[in-house]
Design a protein with these regions (language model features):
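Ligand-binding pockets and gating/stacking loops
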Residues: 1-224
Length: 224
């Protein structure tokens, strides 16, 4: 097989597409051989499991995701998603939020603390949020979708700790200070991971496009 590979590469030494394909196959092989160890949470100490809450029914699901996230980050995985299940979309019963929050408060706090004690938080950006908030006014026993004002938080990876940025009116209806558009958030995240969002611009059908549209700005006030 090695000989066939050598013959195939002859005359293609400068073919970047071939190198990219070989690199992709090698990455897939490394993932298949290393994934079982990375996903084996039994290798963690009882104290670590207790810290995350994997031993409790309420927090078990999200705790396992957060603990796995830390193990993946340790091994160089660049992008990890942990989804909180539950009824956040509470049109019918806003009191469910208390139950859902109880499933994730301990695990996410443990994740931040664990990353910090292992020296990983400074080089890991943690982003917590959803696509919209909930209205301050009632919708039956719940709340409606509210995209006009809601909160997201970022930690680690170049973010200034202990900082609150922006404010709403007293009811939480609308933003009154330091409005951050979703494109600004995306521009800031890209900046923190080392990408200039303006250099991702491409031309299509006579106009410019990029991930942050054409008006996103980095929020420098929250950067460390």
């Amino acid at each position: 097989i090695r000989r066939f590979s050598e013959l195939h590469r002859q005359g293609r030494e400068d073919d970047s597409r071939l190198e990219a394909r070989i690199g992709a196959f090698e990455l897939a092989f490394r993932m298949q051989t290393q994934a079982p160890e990375a996903f084996d949470l039994s290798r963690e100490s009882p104290a670590t499991h207790k810290m995350y809450g994997t031993d409790q029914k309420t927090t078990k699901d999200y705790a396992q995701q957060c603990l796995l996230a830390r193990r993946l980050v340790e091994r160089g995985v660049r992008y990890v998603v942990a989804n909180v299940s539950g009824k956040w979309d509470s049109h019918g019963n806003v009191r469910d939020h208390e139950k859902v929050a109880a499933t994730c408060d301990q695990p996410v706090a443990a994740l931040l603390g664990d990353l910090k004690q292992r020296g990983l938080l400074d080089e890991t950006l943690v982003v917590w949020g959803g696509e919209f908030g909930r209205t301050p006014t009632a919708q039956g026993s719940g709340r409606d979708h509210h995209p006009h004002a809601f909160t997201m938080w970022l930690a680690g990876g170049g973010v200034k700790p202990g900082t609150t940025y922006g404010a709403t009116d007293e009811f939480g209806f609308y933003i009154t200070e330091n409005k951050v558009h979703i494109h600004d958030l995306h521009a800031t995240i890209l900046h923190l991971v080392g990408l200039d969002h303006e250099r991702l611009t491409y031309r299509y059908s006579g106009r410019d496009f990029r991930l942050t549209d054409v008006h996103g700005n980095v929020v420098h006030d929250i950067l460390a």
